[in-house]
């Protein structure tokens, strides 16, 4: 397979268990399972999944797309930027949010939105300030001071093409603010969230830096580095392409070891008993999907997000309910994706 970052050859270095291709609850309950195969570029060390068609990639998101982000999370990002670049940083700036078709980073009518599909309420609010297009294939003929790329880069089939087109719309002294999941973090903790179909590329700080250098960009400042990498990026006029050497085989071996430990903790906790599930998001779906037939023992699934209620949990035929006390059984074991003051509960965020 050809590297979708630099065009060189790759080698296969890892395969996941069978995972649901769409990790979101749906109204229909029809799910396809397949493995994710991870390929490492011999030259630039980019990590990518196997090739999928555009039509196949769209199917990973299902028909019942959910809004995964929150206003307070966006507000924290904006505050972090102001703390690093000044409280008036956004004044008189032309701004573009690539991938903001569902949940734009700023509710400001001067912001431009670019996405392959933009919700009607977003179109209505931003008037003519939107581009409904595939940024991997199409260019935007306008220059911006600031471009946001928030949890979008990892979803591109061809990140080099996307970055190249985004760069064309950046003013020479402009900045791109990029946020991606930190793959290094997920090789050690919450490993169930490390590799799945929607994330077509995996980035540590070095992997991200390599992709940017190939496109004559560089990381100006790392704003946050935890389970995510949030950084400012600028054009590199020196044209020096510094490629970091990365031992991807070592990285995936570390993941494999910690992934097995995660599976072991879940199996030991549930001990083949009936159990309740609290939280039905992608993290829970991936955690339970990592263990064969474990969903057969689910008693009830609860989620207080009304958009998920009465929908079907992936890899099962079980409906999701809003939690009420009438369902509560203190003696039955449970697994959750948040802190739950209940005896016999395992919080997957802690493993």
Task: For the regions a language model picked out, list residue spans one by one.
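Hydrophobic, well-ordered beta-alpha structural blocks that scaffold small-molecule cofactor pockets
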Residues: 230-351
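Residues in the short beta-alpha loop(s) of Rossmann-like NAD(P)-binding domains
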Residues: 115-117, 182, 304-305
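Substrate-binding/catalytic lobe of Class I Rossmann-like enzymes that use SAM or dcSAM, i.e.
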Residues: 209-241
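Short, glycine-/aromatic-enriched active-site segment of Class I SAM-dependent methyltransferases
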Residues: 17-25, 178-201, 205-211
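Short catalytic micro-motifs in class I SAM-dependent methyltransferases
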Residues: 150-152, 157
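A SAM-dependent methyltransferase catalytic signature shared across enzymes that methylate proteins
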Residues: 2-12, 205-222
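A short glycine-rich, Lys/Arg-flanked "PGG" loop and its adjoining helix->strand segment in the class I
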Residues: 160-175
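Conserved N-terminal segment of class I S-adenosyl-L-methionine
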Residues: 1-150, 163, 225, 237-269, ...
